[in-house]
């Protein structure tokens, strides 16, 4: 059983690349905005961000372009959809089960501190004694 579990784990973590992804990755090394434009479109947020990165700094534009190609790959989307179909459902509805308040609420900024009520309020400026001249 452990062997089947290991093989299933290896299969889930593998990522195969197709020829379009490979071509866009190579293109991303030389002209990163073109690779992002081919995947996302001309006036998309990622394309404009990559163009800005390309004009200011070349290396981050390459990393961003490779990330966009990886995230939008058809092979990756197929793998993720298959993973979600076989994964057990987890109830993570936080509104249905709100967290209990275990700590007391801190006082608001406009409230006076009752513990230090006998101490006169002072500003943070240094006070010069009136005896000095």
From Swiss-Prot:
Intervals, Lumenal compartment: 38-48
GO annotation, cellular component aspect: fungal-type vacuole; fungal-type vacuole lumen; late endosome membrane; membrane
Broad class of where this protein is predominantly found: membrane
InterPro entries in UniProt: PMP3
UniProt entry tagged with the keyword Ubl conjugation: yes
Ranges annotated as biased composition (Polar residues): 124-133
Database matches in Pfam families: Pmp3
Range of residues in the leader sequence: none
Keyword Nucleotide-binding attached: no
Membrane-protein topology: Multi-pass membrane protein
PANTHER family: HYDROPHOBIC PROTEIN RCI2 LOW TEMPERATURE AND SALT RESPONSIVE PROTEIN LTI6 -RELATED (PTHR21659), PROTEIN SNA2-RELATED (PTHR21659:SF112)
Family: Belongs to the UPF0057 (PMP3) family.
Entry protein name: Protein SNA3
């Amino acid at each position: 059983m452990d062997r089947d579990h290991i093989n299933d784990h290896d299969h889930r973590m593998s990522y195969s690349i197709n020829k379009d992804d490979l071509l866009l990755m190579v293109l991303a090394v030389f002209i990163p905005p073109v690779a992002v434009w081919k995947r996302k479109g001309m006036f998309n947020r990622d394309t404009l961000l990559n163009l800005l990165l390309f004009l200011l700094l070349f290396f981050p534009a390459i990393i961003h372009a490779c990330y966009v190609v990886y995230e939008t790959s058809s092979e990756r989307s197929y793998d993720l959809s298959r993973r979600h179909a076989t994964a057990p459902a987890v109830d993570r509805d936080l509104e249905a089960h709100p967290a209990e308040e275990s700590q007391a609420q801190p006082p608001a900024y406009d409230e006076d501190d009752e513990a230090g009520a006998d101490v006169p309020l002072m500003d943070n400026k240094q006070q010069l004694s009136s005896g000095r001249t």
